[in-house]
């Protein structure tokens, strides 16, 4: 894990994060009848036609299927590396996996959203469009991810990459809703993001006394797999859909025979997604300790056995991205990812470093999050690239694209985004009002099962901490293979009276050390750096530092 950190202060419109894992989502289900799901679930009719008969009509289709780009706009070769701004490897690894998700990338490169977006404040779709466009159009270079991507989430230390990933996906889903806020919740599941990543669970309970059947459905955007007793992803999926007996104290209260009776409960995938996000539950929700074991995962995965209907043909998915955590705890270590470019070549994306890899190396990792896409979808996007232009052959400069953080220059061409992208980033970073933020917080209460660790210390009155870690224990020792960060912030934390300070930079570390003794008896507070007050400028030695504004009381 990187030693030094940067707190990205400021408000973000998508400030509430609810983790959307769905390994056993039964507690969140609302029991409904078979006829209460949409008649045309966004993804089911293409892959599981026989499932559509049980579903009810949608009040409004927010993102019709025909609006998804049918042809690929992605460059065939791999794109840019991402600069680590201090403890942001989890951000970079997650963004690379999303950047190389074909349906999402193609939609972003079409720029259809920015042409119709009427929001005047932060929009995650606009921000992601700008990022993906820059990343894919700057191969061989290193770019700085927009601070708006992590605003309201990053607190200057290691965070959970899966939490950030789903925070971003959920924010993009919410960005599809302006202008459609009065629609029913089924129609909300027809958004562009749900069409790409979403599907439906079916929880079926069968009373063993009267043989009555109750079906409950719930949408999902990712699937969490328990790996404690599993040696492979297939075994974890089998355990997930294994029937459960309800008897004794757990007997089922049947709504048909109106009595408590033994029952059988089964959880299956009712509709499949274009893109599957499978998260391997490697971290304890209480301590954050890691399950350090190898779990095998295939390059091609047939999901037919885990569907509600198994009497049709294979439903094959192919692997296109892997998010990896190196370390023994969620509080330390390092995140990186492997992605499959549209030309078919695998690459390791390790912050600024981009190197060619092989499928053998990809399948040998201790994966944390796996990304699969339907084989038919991948082939369709790959064929469109072949028709458009021939993939560029790997040359010597492509085989090992290494651009370290020390090689970045202030006038590096890749740091200059296209004119449209700059406009989008500027619009996305505008802050929402405090009243609006409070309203959203009231409307989106944190789920009870989401354990939020209380933040000690005092924050400036104009700073809002949107996301807090779910883990209760504090930070542990750093991973021995720590990364060096661009920003060397002092370990000194401001006192209650100095909590309005924006931060201490590397160039002022001496001053911070001299004042450390004066503050050692004061209550510790979080170090807060406002991103907007930092400016990029070179030092005499060629390294990069940042000008800032600091106020003392």
UniProtKB/Swiss-Prot annotation:
The answer to keyword Secreted applying to this record is no
Protein role: Deubiquitinating enzyme that removes conjugated ubiquitin from specific proteins to regulate different cellular processes that may include cell proliferation, progression through the cell cycle, apoptosis, cell migration, and the cellular response to viral infection.
Gene expressing this chain: USP17L15
Q: What is this protein called?
A: Ubiquitin carboxyl-terminal hydrolase 17-like protein 15
| A biological-process GO annotation | regulation of apoptotic process
Q: Which residues form the active site?
A: 89 (nucleophile), 334 (proton acceptor)
Amino acid composition bias (Basic residues), ranges on this chain: 510-524
Q: Which top EC class is given?
A: hydrolase
Please verify whether the record's keywords include Plastid: no
| Compartments where found | Nucleus; Endoplasmic reticulum
């Amino acid at each position: 894990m990187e030693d030094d950190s940067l707190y990205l202060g400021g408000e973000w419109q998508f400030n509430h994060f609810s983790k959307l894992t769905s390994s056993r989502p039964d507690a969140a289900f609302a029991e409904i009848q078979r006829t209460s799901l949409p008649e045309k679930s966004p993804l089911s009719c293409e892959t599981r036609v026989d499932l559509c008969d049980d579903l009810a009509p949608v009040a409004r289709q927010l993102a019709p299927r025909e609006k998804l780009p049918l042809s690929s706009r992605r460059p065939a070769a791999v794109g840019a590396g991402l600069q680590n701004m201090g403890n942001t490897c989890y951000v970079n690894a997650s963004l690379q996996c999303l950047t190389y998700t074909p349906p999402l990338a193609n939609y972003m490169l079409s720029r259809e959203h920015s042409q119709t977006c009427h929001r005047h404040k932060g929009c995650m779709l606009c921000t992601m469009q700008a990022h993906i466009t820059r990343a894919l159009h700057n191969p061989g270079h290193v770019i700085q991810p927009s601070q708006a991507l992590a605003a309201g989430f990053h607190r200057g230390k290691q965070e959970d990459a899966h939490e950030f990933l789903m925070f971003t996906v959920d924010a993009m889903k919410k960005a599809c809703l302006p202008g459609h806020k009065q629609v029913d919740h089924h129609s909300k599941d027809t958004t562009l993001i749900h069409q790409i990543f979403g599907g439906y669970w079916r929880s079926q309970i069968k009373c063993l006394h009267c043989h009555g059947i109750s079906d409950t459905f719930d949408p999902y955007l990712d699937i969490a797999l328990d790996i404690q007793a599993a040696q492979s992803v297939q075994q974890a999926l089998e355990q997930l859909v294994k029937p459960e007996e309800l008897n004794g104290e757990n007997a089922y209260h049947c709504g048909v025979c109106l009595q408590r009776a033994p029952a059988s409960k089964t959880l299956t995938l009712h509709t499949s997604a274009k893109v599957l996000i499978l998260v391997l539950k490697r971290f304890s929700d209480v301590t954050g300790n890691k399950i350090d074991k190898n779990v095998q995962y295939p390059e091609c995965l047939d999901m037919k056995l885990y569907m509600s209907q198994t009497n049709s043909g294979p439903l094959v998915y192919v692997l296109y991205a892997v998010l990896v955590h190196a370390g023994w705890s969620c509080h330390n270590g390092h995140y990186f990812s492997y992605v499959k470019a549209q030309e078919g070549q695998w690459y390791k994306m390790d912050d600024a470093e981009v190197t060619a890899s092989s499928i053998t190396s990809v399948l040998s990792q201790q994966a944390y999050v796996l990304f699969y896409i339907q084989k038919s979808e991948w082939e369709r996007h790959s064929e469109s690239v072949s028709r458009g232009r021939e993939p560029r052959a790997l040359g010597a400069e492509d085989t090992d694209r290494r651009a370290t953080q020390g090689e970045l220059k202030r006038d590096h061409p890749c740091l200059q985004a296209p004119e449209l992208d700059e406009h989008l980033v500027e619009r996305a970073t505008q802050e929402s009002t405090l009243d609006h933020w409070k309203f959203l917080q009231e409307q989106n209460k944190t789920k009870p099962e989401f354990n939020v660790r209380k933040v000690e210390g005092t924050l400036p009155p104009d700073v809002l901490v949107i996301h807090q870690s779910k883990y209760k224990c504090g930070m542990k020792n750093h991973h021995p293979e720590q990364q060096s960060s661009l920003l060397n912030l002092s370990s000194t934390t401001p006192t209650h009276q100095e909590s309005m300070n924006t931060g201490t930079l590397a160039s002022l570390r001496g001053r911070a050390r001299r004042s450390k003794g004066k503050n050692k008896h004061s209550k510790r507070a979080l170090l807060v750096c406002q991103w907007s007050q930092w400016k990029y400028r070179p030092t005499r030695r060629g390294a990069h530092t940042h000008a800032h504004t600091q106020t003392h009381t």
